[in-house]
A protein has these predicted regions:
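Active-site acidic short loop of glycosyltransferases
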Residues: 1, 26, 107
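A recurrent flexible, glycine/aromatic-enriched loop bordering the glycosyltransferase active site
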Residues: 64-96
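Beta-sheet entry/capping signal
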Residues: 2-4, 29-31, 94
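The conserved acidic donor/metal-binding loop of glycosyltransferases
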Residues: 3, 7-11
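A short, conserved alpha-helix in the catalytic core of glycosyltransferases
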Residues: 19-20, 89, 93-95, 100-106, ...
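Conserved donor NDP-sugar-binding/catalytic core segment of glycosyltransferases
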Residues: 11, 15-66
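Conserved residues at the C-terminal ends of beta-strands
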Residues: 6, 35, 108
């Protein structure tokens, strides 16, 4: 079994889940996040990310989440663009994970009161 977490403001497009489940089936210790596209809140214009614009989660020394470009060493490590990208952290409310692996990691800490903490929790 797998678990998928989505923040309440997330909208999914057709076919978004299958690639995530495929990666978990190949390696149950992989935590997968979909590419996050943007829908403009004024015009509803859909902006999709191509491979060159992809970023990974990172954090500053003040432990605040930030998006960072995929490092060149990580781009070179990958054999093809669809291969998982290693990331120091991730968006905490938008991912899929093997249920047993999530439990092994300790699940979410019930003491966290706000969503901001989840971005760094599994890093």
């Amino acid at each position: 079994p797998t678990l998928t977490f989505l923040d309440s403001h997330v909208e999914c497009c057709p076919g978004w889940l299958e690639p995530l489940l495929d990666r978990i089936a190949r390696d149950p210790t992989t935590v997968v996040c979909p590419v996050i596209d943007v829908i403009d809140d004024g015009s509803f214009y859909f902006s999709w990310q191509n491979e060159n614009g992809l970023q990974v989660g990172g954090f500053k020394w003040a432990l605040t989440f930030t998006w960072i470009p995929i490092p060149e060493r990580e781009r070179k490590r990958k054999k093809f663009p669809g291969e998982p990208t290693r990331s120091p952290t991730m968006a905490g409310g938008l991912f899929s994970i093997d249920k047993a692996f999530f439990e092994k990691l300790g699940m979410y800490d019930p003491g966290f009161d706000i969503w901001v903490s989840y971005k760094l929790y599994f890093s």
